[in-house]
Amino acid sequence: MAEPALGFIGIGKMGLPMTVRLLAAGYRVTAFNRTPARLQAVRDAGAEVADSPAAVAARADIVFLCLTDTQAVEDVAFGEVGVGAGGSAGKLLVDCSSISPEATRRMADRLAATAGMRWMDAPVSGGVEGARRGTLIFMCGGESDEVERVRPVLGCLGQRATHIGPVGSGQAAKLCNQAIVSCNLAAIAEVINLARRAGLGEARLPQALAGGFADSLPLQIYGPRMAVPAVGEPLGEVATMMKDVANVLELARSLGASMPMTAAAEDLYRRTADLGYRHGDLETLMRLYDR
């Protein structure tokens, strides 16, 4: 069977390394980004470049999205020159963005009705480094045949793809993930501040806790960055976490689920944004403890 032609829309912090990995694996990829300058890196890696999401959908069998929020996904899918305008029956949209489960179900129904395309949500966890190394995990929502159709492609990008359930289930699982991560990062910032005030040598704390019950990938990645500011390139924005936590709490309210820890974390991210770090890296949570 011939390899599917792929499309990738959203060449950002995650989309760029994901697209490069697909090209390195030998897939033909057509790319689009709202800011054309971001396309040069994937063009240099061998991607074809399209002038609209519709053009991507016309050339590709499977179209990947990796966008900032629900509105961006809706615009790309259903704009005048959106995916729906170029898609047709038999094509598949795979959304790796982190967005609302309810909106995902609504958009999946709309795309099927207007273009005949099927929709699979496949948000990721693992961050920029996981995208570069091909160690992402995918939380998949959709029909089982869709998941199996795209599984070989996901294997080039990540270590595991789990079929959670029908459309929207992957997004709900990602929100569970983000609830844990948001609380974890908030706790790490508190503890780095505590270690600093206790004179423990906070930069060594992540190494000291490695392998114990308190250890985590966020601790090992962000602990050193919180202890020694401005180490390495930005990995994730406060604004993005605020968006995800807002979606977590919206889902919780709709289900009558109490999430007091996540609500407390939301307040900490909001306060960090109010200090001027809305578009700062997540390590800027430490600025809450400067005074």
Go through the PLM ranges and name each one.
Residues 98-178:
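Rossmann-fold dinucleotide-binding core
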Residues 53-118:
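Rossmann-fold NAD(P) dinucleotide-binding segment
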Residues 18-19, 107, 153, 194:
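Hydrophobic residues within alpha-helices
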Residues 14, 18, 66, 96, ...:
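Methionine-biased hydrophobic packing positions in alpha-helices, especially
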Residues 35, 69, 143:
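Residues in the short beta-alpha loop(s) of Rossmann-like NAD(P)-binding domains
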Residues 1-65, 91, 96-97, 128, ...:
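NAD(P)+-binding Rossmann beta1-loop-alpha1 motif at the extreme N-terminus of oxidoreductases
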Residues 169-291:
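Helical "substrate-binding/catalytic lid" subdomain
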